[in-house]
């Protein structure tokens, strides 16, 4: 059995002292390899982690972005709040997918060879997506139970039944909180536009609000609250504070599976938005050392770097680590470890810039 290199341009395919049966005769690839060897090596503060999928690890040591990209064109200066939110959820992936147009792989779903006792996260989402809108429309609990059992998400047996009853009770309480908040009539639609200047260029952050009420904004998601929920609520909240119409409180209420949170009035929303747009403009040119879960863990645990690293790197208690995302791995390839002494201050600065103003306005119930 002959093991051929995965890539047609692998060095092993052009090694004259190697196995002749795997040798390549592609002149273009050979010339490219010669040029890469002739180029002076670039120094890095810390070696990149070698990807186990690479033939010899050489690819992992080559920076994916050796230099910042050119400044984004004028079309990027128009910033819908949804786009800014998508950027902050994963700046590295956003840079590769939106600015460079790459299509990154998502983790493949593992095929099950047995029937689970309880739904996992994948099976949980469709069940909630079917039941919650019906409960918000006033569907009785017994009818919701029938609707749940009509789908494939609830496993058979006692474990599945107990899971369903627990979820129905939780969803019913959650829907009641949402309905209580939405009892107030909706106000006329409101368009919010905030121009901010970054390096002499004006960027426009904007959003349309069709769900404003006198008590402010409502954001809800039936899941455990976390940095994603705070960020998704924070950006519209800043626009509301900067452009609140008469008769509307500059307050945002967030309802989650495990409780509620509130965002109170921000004293300087334009300045905060300007800082976020500065990060956005920078993140459109080079990988930004902002990772929401890791950054929040650092801020929320008395600036413990160990807590941030635990969120970023996979381990027994963190199989879905933030640093394992394909976009993060590719964007950071060949660059210093973001938590190394040489560059960790950039991680600190980004975390503070995003989360310090948010935490100053955040109240938990």
Language-model features, listed with the residues they occupy:
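Anion-coordinating catalytic cores for phosphoryl-, nucleotidyl-, and glycosidic chemistry
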Residues: 1-365
């Amino acid at each position: 059995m002959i093991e051929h290199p995965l890539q047609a341009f692998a060095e092993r395919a052009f090694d004259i002292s190697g196995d002749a049966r795997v040798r390549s005769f592609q002149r273009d690839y050979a010339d490219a390899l010669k040029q890469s060897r002739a180029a002076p090596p670039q120094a890095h503060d810390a070696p990149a982690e070698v990807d186990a999928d690479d033939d010899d690890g050489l690819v992992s040591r080559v920076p994916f972005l050796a230099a910042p990209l050119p400044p984004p064109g004028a079309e990027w200066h128009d910033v819908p709040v949804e786009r800014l939110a998508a950027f902050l959820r994963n700046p590295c992936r956003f840079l590769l997918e939106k600015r460079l147009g790459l299509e990154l792989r998502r983790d493949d779903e593992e095929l099950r060879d047995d029937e689970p006792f309880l739904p996992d996260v994948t099976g949980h989402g469709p069940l909630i997506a079917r039941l919650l809108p019906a409960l918000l429309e006033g569907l009785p609990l017994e009818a919701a139970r029938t609707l749940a059992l009509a789908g494939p998400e609830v496993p058979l047996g006692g474990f599945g039944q107990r899971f369903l009853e627990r979820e129905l009770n939780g969803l019913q309480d959650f829907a009641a909180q949402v309905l209580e908040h939405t009892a107030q009539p909706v106000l006329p639609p409101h368009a919010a536009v905030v121009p901010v200047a970054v390096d002499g260029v004006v960027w426009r952050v904007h959003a349309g609000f069709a769900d404003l009420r006198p008590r402010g904004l409502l954001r809800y998601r039936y899941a455990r609250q976390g940095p994603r929920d705070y960020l998704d609520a924070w950006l519209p909240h800043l626009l509301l504070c900067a452009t609140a119409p008469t008769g509307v409180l500059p307050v945002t209420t967030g309802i989650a599976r495990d409780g509620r949170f509130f965002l109170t009035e921000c004293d300087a929303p334009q300045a905060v938005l300007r800082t976020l747009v500065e990060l956005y403009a920078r993140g459109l040119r080079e990988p930004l050392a902002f990772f929401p879960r890791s950054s929040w863990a650092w801020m929320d645990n008395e600036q413990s770097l160990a807590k941030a690293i635990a969120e970023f790197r996979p381990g027994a208690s963190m199989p879905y680590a933030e640093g394992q995302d394909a976009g993060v791995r590719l964007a950071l390839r060949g660059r210093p470890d973001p938590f190394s002494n040489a560059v960790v201050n950039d991680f600190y600065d980004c975390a503070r810039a995003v989360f310090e103003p948010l935490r100053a306005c955040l109240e938990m119930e």
